[in-house]
Amino acid sequence: MIHHFITKLIATVVAAFCLTSCTIGGDDTDEYGSGLLQKGTPAPDFTIYTDSHPEGFALSSLQGQYVLIEFWASWCPDCQKETENMKRLYATYAPLGVVFVGVSFDTDKEEWQQYIHDNGLDWIQYSELKPWKESTLSTAYNIKWIPTLYLIDKEGRVVQGTVDVNAMDTLLASLNLNGQ
């Protein structure tokens, strides 16, 4: 009787482990990337202020070009892990005409600028210098996790939103960017 109970208990524990290991060890990008703007949605416009453009320029002024927007922060461990991958994407696709825009949720301007400088993030960088949850852009783009990437097409519409840098790389590689 006890042997039968122990056998059932072990079988139950093994089954539970197998079922949960699919989610625990699995891909969390579906959960964190849920609720992002859908393909074809007009990208919410915003004005980007940088040291080189202190008067600012609108995201919509980049229509006619693909734009990759990366929502990130210097204090974010996942963003830090993806820095080299983002630099690789920039080196690969910026020469093909993709405009890269980093939107940071940093609140300390000096730390943010130091991270950009130390890591050679050579694309457009912008921050409202507000906490993530207080950012108007976080709300407009339904950001639940960082880094989050959006590819905007030449007409200003969302092609894809994702928390997976590799998925964005695959998408960019599938586009006919050489033919512009």
Region spans (language model):
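Conserved redox-active cysteine motifs that mediate thiol-disulfide chemistry
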Residues: 71-88
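A short beta-strand-turn-helix
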Residues: 46-67
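Thiol/disulfide oxidoreductase modules built on the thioredoxin-like
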Residues: 121, 129-176
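Short pre-active-site segment immediately N-terminal to redox-active cysteine/selenocysteine motifs
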Residues: 65-67, 71-75, 145
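Bacterial Sec-dependent N-terminal signal peptides
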Residues: 1-30, 179
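Conserved segment of the thioredoxin-like fold in thiol-based oxidoreductases
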Residues: 91-133, 143-146
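N-proximal helix/coil linker or "cap" segments that precede and/or mark the start of modular domains
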Residues: 22-45, 60-63, 114-117, 174
